[in-house]
């Protein structure tokens, strides 16, 4: 092992905002059965089948898409279908004062909900603007180039935060997450409901080669989803790993690999994601 790692070495470099401090301090309360039920009634009154979120591995190429990363195929599909597109600065990075990534490479909101956003009152004081499909596609490519992880979401919480709850089923987005500021890092402190929608892409696995791993701890610094543990001085991915790819990008030994199940069909996986979202959201407005 490269060094004797301490608990501090294994802590992710995540935002230390008042909201995250609150999540760390009080998140455990949401695991109590009675509070969990109250949480569900308040935040998911229509159940979970009308919401969805999907993490997409950054810069992931496989099968027939060796020349095109999978996230772009999905993003281009939905951007082409969107009637309205609004580009918004990342509220996570704006409120955290991010120094590592461009705050302008934020969310791509789509649909009639996006058309009804109050651009003067966006979360976190972010700024936004109406964009063309071409601008949205350029934005997505710039975000991937900047090392941000794309995530597709249709969530009630977003509609509430952006004050467009009346358009909940006509409002979805791509957000581009950094390991230092993403508010989703707080989900590991709360109950299992927080993780219900944040899924690893089907067929994707992330593995560490123990022969190459020197136990430097660099991967732990960028894993904000509690997806790693230490075993015999080596990093091991847990069931909570969402397959984002941050750890792959930072490993100095190239010991971590993002893999796709050879028995799975990437076209079917992509089509399943598209179908899952198109069943619950219409962004043509």
Predicted regions and their residues:
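Local cysteine-cluster metal-coordination motifs and their immediate loop/turn environment
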Residues: 86-102, 109, 172-185, 211-225, ...
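Residue-level detector of anion-binding/catalytic polar loops
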Residues: 149, 247, 257
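Ferredoxin-like iron-sulfur electron-transfer modules
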Residues: 156-173, 193-243, 257-267, 282-285
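Compact structured core domains
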Residues: 126-159, 165-166, 172-181
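General detector of N-terminal leader/presequence modules that precede the first folded domain
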Residues: 1-128
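Intrinsically disordered, low-complexity Ser/Thr/Pro/Gly-rich regulatory segments
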Residues: 189-190
């Amino acid at each position: 092992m490269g060094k004797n790692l301490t608990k501090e070495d294994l802590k992710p470099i995540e935002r230390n905002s008042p909201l995250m401090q609150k999540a760390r301090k009080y998140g455990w309360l949401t695991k109590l059965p009675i509070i969990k039920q109250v949480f569900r009634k308040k935040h998911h009154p229509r159940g979970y089948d009308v919401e969805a979120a999907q993490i997409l591995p950054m810069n992931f190429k496989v099968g027939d898409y060796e020349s095109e990363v999978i996230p772009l195929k999905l993003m281009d599909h939905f951007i082409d279908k969107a009637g309205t597109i609004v580009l918004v600065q990342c509220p996570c990075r704006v409120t955290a004062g991010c120094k590592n990534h461009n705050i302008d490479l934020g969310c791509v909101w789509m649909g009639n909900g996006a058309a009804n956003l109050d651009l003067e009152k966006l979360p976190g004081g972010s700024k936004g603007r109406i964009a063309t499909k071409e601008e949205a596609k350029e934005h997505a490519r710039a975000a991937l180039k900047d090392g941000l992880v794309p995530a597709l979401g249709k969530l009630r919480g977003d509609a509430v935060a952006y004050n467009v709850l009346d358009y909940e089923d006509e409002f979805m987005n791509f957000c581009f997450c950094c390991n230092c500021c993403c508010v989703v890092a707080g989900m590991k402190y709360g109950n299992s409901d927080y993780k219900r929608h944040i899924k690893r892409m089907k067929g994707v696995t992330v593995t560490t080669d123990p022969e190459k791993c020197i136990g430097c701890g660099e991967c732990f610094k960028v894993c904000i989803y509690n997806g790693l543990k230490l075993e015999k001085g080596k990093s091991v991915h847990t069931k909570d790993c969402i397959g984002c790819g941050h750890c792959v990008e930072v490993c100095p030994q190239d010991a971590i690999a993002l893999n796709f199940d050879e028995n799975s069909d990437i076209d079917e996986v992509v089509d399943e994601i598209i179908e899952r979202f198109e069943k619950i959201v219409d962004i043509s407005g």
